[in-house]
Design a protein with these regions (language model features):
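ATPase catalytic-site recognition across NTP-hydrolyzing enzymes
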Residues: 34-109
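ASCE P-loop NTPase helicase motor core
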Residues: 1-52, 180-185
Length: 312
């Protein structure tokens, strides 16, 4: 179908997230806007939106394939999100902003086996601006190589900012994450600049403590909710086109979210891990506490009117 051809023409990223001139099907996509028609102006647009609604207008006239699936991020918000080009490429790591000594940096690794299947991904988020600074994704880098990339990113931030105390990093410790912890132990945690952040031990926790973050259904849904609120309220700045592409295919499945069949969500998983790290960091850094609490708040929320009950 035309929709499939268009979507494949829009998919311009290779396995490492680098952008090419044409889509994966060899076609080059371009758009013709509704206002290029000589008989259509703002007045016509407003009347048409009033007749069919904004979402259908953007689908019918705006060249936007707004999905009917229940995406984590509102489909209209996804349609207006635009990524940018990296200012620097260090290997497969794409940098969208130069680190600054006045900010704190949250670096999250979602590991993978590195055998060509699932991707490993790293996200670098600046605090308290909540701006995406860098990302890395690869599916043929073994776990020792993933830890070296994590270390190189931390070292670059430390060298650029001259402030290793402003770096916090962590890994997901589910499944393959256990292998990552072993590699970190062999590599030497002290050889990676910054502080290794782990989730606090919960009351009633009986398992042996492991560093990093363990992802459960509950923690994933909570992190998804926070990510949704932050992006839809413009509290989090996303620069990565591959991440935006993943968000467009990240849909509700049962009571959770995951990528559509044939799509990936590894960059999202690393972002969710960074969100969970922020939940820990807010108890340490007053700037993060104030801004993260505000970022979690839905601006459209209105408290209910009070109810008074009188016995007379």
């Amino acid at each position: 179908t035309f929709a499939t051809i268009w979507k494949q023409a829009e998919q311009k990223f290779d396995e490492s997230g680098n952008e090419s001139e044409v889509g994966i099907n060899g076609f080059h996509a371009f758009r013709a806007s509704w206002d290029e028609h000589p008989d259509r102006d703002e007045q016509w647009r407003d009347a048409e939106i009033g007749r069919i609604g904004e979402e259908k207008f953007r689908r019918e006239y705006g060249c936007e394939f707004l999905v009917f699936d229940e995406t984590l991020i509102n489909s209209i918000k996804l349609a207006v999100m635009e990524g940018g080009s990296p200012i620097l490429n260090m290997g497969q790591t794409r940098w969208y902003k130069k680190p600054s000594p006045e900010y704190t940096y949250c670096i999250a690794l979602d590991p993978s086996m590195g055998t060509g299947g699932d991707y490993a991904a790293i996200q670098v988020i600046e605090l308290p601006t909540y701006e995406q600074v860098a990302e890395w994704r690869h599916n043929t880098t073994a776990i020792p190589g993933q830890i070296r990339v994590l270390s190189d990113i931390c070292k670059y931030v430390a060298d650029t900012t001259s402030n290793p105390q402003g770096i916090y990093w962590s890994v997901e410790n589910n499944g393959l994450g256990e292998a990552a912890l072993i590699v970190i132990n062999d590599y030497g945690e002290e050889n990676i600049p910054g502080l290794f952040v782990s989730e606090p031990i919960r009351k009633g926790h009986v398992r042996k403590f492991r560093k990093g973050f363990n992802t459960t259904h509950s923690t994933k849904v909570t992190a998804c909710s926070r990510l949704k609120t932050m992006i839809e309220n413009d509290k989090m700045i996303v620069h990565s086109k591959p991440l935006i592409s993943e968000l467009k295919g990240y849909v509700a499945t049962g009571s959770s979210y995951q990528a559509k069949v044939g799509m990936t969500d590894d960059l999202i998983s690393a972002t969710l891990l960074a969100i969970r790290m922020m939940g820990v960091l807010k108890d340490w850094d007053p700037r993060v506490y104030n801004t993260f609490t505000q970022a979690e708040t839905d601006e459209d929320y209105e408290p209910p009117m009070p109810i008074f009950i009188s016995g007379y």
